[in-house]
C-alpha cells in the first residue's frame, strides 16, 4: 500500500501493521514509499472489509513554518494491492473505481493542528473516489525505521481547575493521548498539547506559534 498523503489501513476493524504516518515523507515528485504486510490472520471466511483512512499529510496538508498547504498536490490519493493465494490460485484485489468512498469519522487530521473525531458511527457511502493511483513505478520500499508506538506512559500528575484538567506526564515526548470515552454521551472533549506550564500552572502554548496541536473528540449518543 502507498499514498500521496498518509494512510492507515484495517481489515475487519483491525489495524494493519504498527506504523504511524505511513507511508512516510518523501520528495513526492520523484518517489513515494510503500509498505507490505502479512494479513492472513486478519482474513476470515466469507465477506471481508478492507478500509483505508486517507489524510493530507505532507503531500497537500499544512507543512513548514510558513503554514503552506498543497505543496506537492491538491488532494491525497491512495493505492493498494491485496494479494490472495489459496486453493483457487493467486488473485489480486486492486484499488480502483469499485472502491466505495465513505463519510469519515475524522473531520480533520493534520500534523500541526491535530484531529477532530466524530464517534457517531458515521460510515455512509458518499460516492466513489477519483483519487486512486494504481501506477507504482515511482514507489520505493522504505529504508528507515518506521514510526511506531514504542512505550506507554502513565500520567504523573493531574490538576483540575474548573472544567480544565492539566495532565502532566513528567517529560516531553512525541506521542498521542489515549482516553476512555465509554462514559460519554453527546459530549465533547478537547485535548491541547504543550511542552511547558505557565507560572500559574496553566498550559503554555505560545511556542507552538500557529499550530493548534489539539484533539477534539465528539462522543455520540450511545456509549462506546
PLM region spans:
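Extracellular/oxidizing-compartment recognition motifs
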Residues: 1-224
Amino acid at each position: 500500500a502507498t499514498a500521496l498523503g498518509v494512510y492507515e489501513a484495517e481489515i475487519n476493524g483491525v489495524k494493519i501493521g504498527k506504523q504511524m504516518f505511513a507511508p512516510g515523507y518523501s520528495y513526492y515528485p520523484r518517489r513515494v514509499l510503500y509498505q507490505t504486510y502479512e494479513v492472513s490472520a486478519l482474513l476470515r471466511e466469507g465477506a471481508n472489509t478492507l478500509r483505508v483512512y486517507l489524510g493530507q499529510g505532507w503531500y497537500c496538508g499544512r507543512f513548514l513554518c510558513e503554514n503552506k498547504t498543497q505543496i506537492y498536490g491538491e488532494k491525497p490519493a491512495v493505492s493498494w494491492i491485496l494479494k490472495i493465494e489459496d486453493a483457487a490460485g493467486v488473485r489480486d484485489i486492486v484499488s480502483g473505481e469499485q472502491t466505495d468512498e465513505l463519510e469519515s469519522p475524522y473531520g480533520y487530521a493534520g500534523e500541526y493542528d491535530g484531529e477532530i473525531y466524530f464517534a457517531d458511527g458515521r460510515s455512509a457511502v458518499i460516492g466513489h473516489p477519483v483519487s486512486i493511483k494504481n501506477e507504482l513505478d515511482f514507489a520505493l520500499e522504505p529504508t528507515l525505521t518506521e514510526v511506531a508506538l514504542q512505550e506507554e506512559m502513565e500520567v504523573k500528575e493531574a490538576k483540575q481547575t474548573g472544567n480544565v484538567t492539566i495532565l502532566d506526564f513528567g517529560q516531553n515526548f512525541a506521542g498521542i493521548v489515549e482516553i476512555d470515552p465509554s462514559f460519554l454521551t453527546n459530549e465533547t472533549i478537547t485535548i491541547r498539547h504543550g511542552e511547558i506550564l505557565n507560572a500559574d500552572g496553566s498550559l503554555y502554548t505560545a511556542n507552538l506559534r500557529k499550530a493548534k496541536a489539539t484533539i477534539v473528540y465528539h462522543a455520540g449518543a450511545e456509549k462506546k
